[in-house]
Amino acid sequence: MLKKIVTALGMSGMLLASSNAIAEDTTTKNDNLSPQSVDLSPLRNLNKLDSPMDKDYNYHQAFKKLDTEQLKKDMQDLLTQSQDWWPADFGNYGPFFIRLSWHDAGTYRIYDGRGGANRGQQRFSPLNSWPDNVNLDKARQLLWPIKQKYGDAVSWSDLIVLAGTVSLESMGMKPIGFAFGREDDWQGDDTNWGLSPEEIMSSNVRDGKLAPAYAATQMGLIYVNPEGPDGKPDIKGAASEIRQAFRAMGMTDKETVALIAGGHTFGKTHGAVPEDKVKQAIGPAPDKAPIEQQGLGWHNSYGTGNGDDTMGSGLEGSWTSTPTFWNHDFLHNLYNLDWKKTLSPAGAHQWTPTNAKPENMVPDAHKPGVKHKPIMFTTDLALKEDDGFNKYTQEFYNNPEEFKEEFAKAWFKLTHRDMGPKSRYIGPWIPEQNFIWQDPVPAADYKQVSTQDIAQLEQDIINSGLTNQQLIKTAWDSASTYRKTDYRGGSNGARIALAPEKDWQMNEPAKLEVVLTKLKEIQTNFNNSKTDGTKVSLADLIVLGGNVGVEQAAKQAGYNIQMPFVPGRTDATQAQTDIESFNYLKTKSDGFINYTDGSVSADKLPQTLVEKASMLDLNIPEMTVLVGGMRALDVNYDNSQEGVLTTTPGQLNNSFFVNLLDMSTQWKKSDKKDGEYIGIDRKTGKQKWTASPVDLIFGSNSELKAVAQVYAENGNEQKFVNDFAKAWHKVMMLGRFDVQQ
């Protein structure tokens, strides 16, 4: 029925932007593109170009002038200041703002780190017009006077999450804390949200399984259809979809139950418009609404158009008799009332009790003295009927304080999951407790290495017997796990020495162990030799080793460079590392080292290179110079010679670009290996080189070729080396939120 309602609202034809996801099988926009027309848009920082802020604007600096206590008080006051243009249910906007925050943060998915509350994407299309976000445009509008008052000192993305958190506290649910630090985007991103992005409410489930890389079971929903799978009131099927959807955003069964049961303690759902009047009464979503509505969508011509006549999901009613107070009545009703399937006025599947007592009746949201039966969604009943969920609903029902504590922790995780490590948090309400999902690293309790120490360690590395290639590839494999979407990964923590990273195929475990063993030996000897409290971490040594390898390779090519090095990384422990969670950082292909696990078709490899570069926050020239340098350095996965277009392998020079653009070479597809190309001397017919689609894209794509030509030009040899060094240092510093950059 929800799908029918959405269609009636005129949203089924809404087009959504397409994929930027790393997972090859979720790409939509580029499915029909040939390699030479690879989409480079992920490498263009359009948000920065579109920002109206001054170039020197720094949110962390602007935040310092924010009176956080006054902001909180203003937010608390707003909750009970009902506006005629959008009256508050039960005289309190708290439940409305909880939904706003939840739906903002709930788009996060652990597969690629996309979605979430950071950067305030809910303000833009397509998210602002999703059916699951119906009427949240009004919630953001209610916040506008506060945003206007505090201006640049608080971001929209922080304000939206704060609204829900303050609402919880005002209604008796004490949060464990709140962190500021989210920065705003200025345009909608091009994340791929569904298998059929052209059709709202189309299913992302195939044969009962949520498709990889998605976190919602249907396009336009945050998690699952509350009526049941694809609108069918199937409790068992709903349980399966709930579990898959919440796991896709990194939640356990316990956290899932806490969030749903806790969230449905508050507020109501809206489906007051009769089914036969929905199509006529409800206008289009914000991105298709008439210009005079000024960004507000879903205009409702039925009755008053708001209050008791509000139309939202199509389901109608409240879960508890106290919808603006924290308690465990949701769980009490779930277990003590007998639920019968029925339809809302709008025709949506929901459940009402057959044995409701006066104390179970819920107040009308706008008419004093009027009472209604409580309701449950099909997805709510799944928390009771599914054995895995039942374990926790029973536990929480019998232990209200535990329920409160677990909800508070789950809410904090929900609203902060995409912010990255704790070092990115700012503000006065940051909880002292660390959580494993924050990918914690220990604080340094020792003195950092001096310039003299660094010189000594560099010499120790040179004398270790490790090759430049070993050092460079290990440093790359460590740092290149970073992804800018949720600020995870990177060199800090040295998790390449821990499970699961040490066992990843792309890291060549046996070879990696040789390097790590030698670096640990250097670390131990150095630390034992110091009597002044100075120590070096393995994480720092891995990066320093990569720098040494680059410097030595440049020297062999006739260039003297000094790589910048910023110590301060620390080493995480295995106990601080969630193996399942970190496995999502494992990439299917890494074009910088010509690696693929075989699951990505050859013609998609150039695009996955772009996606990898985007995750590393690189632009087009940085990606280009890094690939060219890595090929010259001869650091491909498994010693592959594909793309090593040089007669001086291991030297840092521009030979890759010079030879790629040399017209004395003719390229042909290999008849022996899919995705391999053979470079043949046009005169002799003899084979000169082999290359991958990733290599040849730099001579095929017009934009990439233009950059490649710059690096192949006479006189730009030193520029190439310098640019490679800068790009290399940038990658090594990804995730270093502990230092000012």
From Swiss-Prot:
It comes from the Bacteria. The keyword ATP-binding does not apply. CDD domains: catalase_peroxidase_1, catalase_peroxidase_2. Its EC number is 1.11.1.21. It is an enzyme of class 1 (oxidoreductase). Its cofactor is heme b. The record marks R99 as: Transition state stabilizer. One of its GO terms (biological process) is cellular response to hydrogen peroxide. It catalyses: H2O2 + AH2 = A + 2 H2O; 2 H2O2 = O2 + 2 H2O. It is found in: Secreted; Periplasm. GO terms for molecular function: catalase activity; heme binding; metal ion binding. Keywords: Heme, Hydrogen peroxide, Iron, Metal-binding, Oxidoreductase, Periplasm, Peroxidase, Secreted, Signal. Residues 1-23 form the signal peptide. The active site is at H103 (proton acceptor). Binds 1 heme b (iron(II)-protoporphyrin IX) group per dimer. Formation of the three residue Trp-Tyr-Met cross-link is important for the catalase, but not the peroxidase activity of the enzyme. One of its GO terms (cellular component) is extracellular region. Bifunctional enzyme with both catalase and broad-spectrum peroxidase activity. HAMAP family: Catal_peroxid. Homodimer or homotetramer. PANTHER family: CATALASE-PEROXIDASE, HYDROPEROXIDASE I, BIFUNCTIONAL CATALASE-PEROXIDASE. NCBIfam families: cat_per_HPI (TIGR00198), PRK15061.1 (NF011635). This is Catalase-peroxidase. It comes from Francisella tularensis subsp. tularensis (strain SCHU S4 / Schu 4).
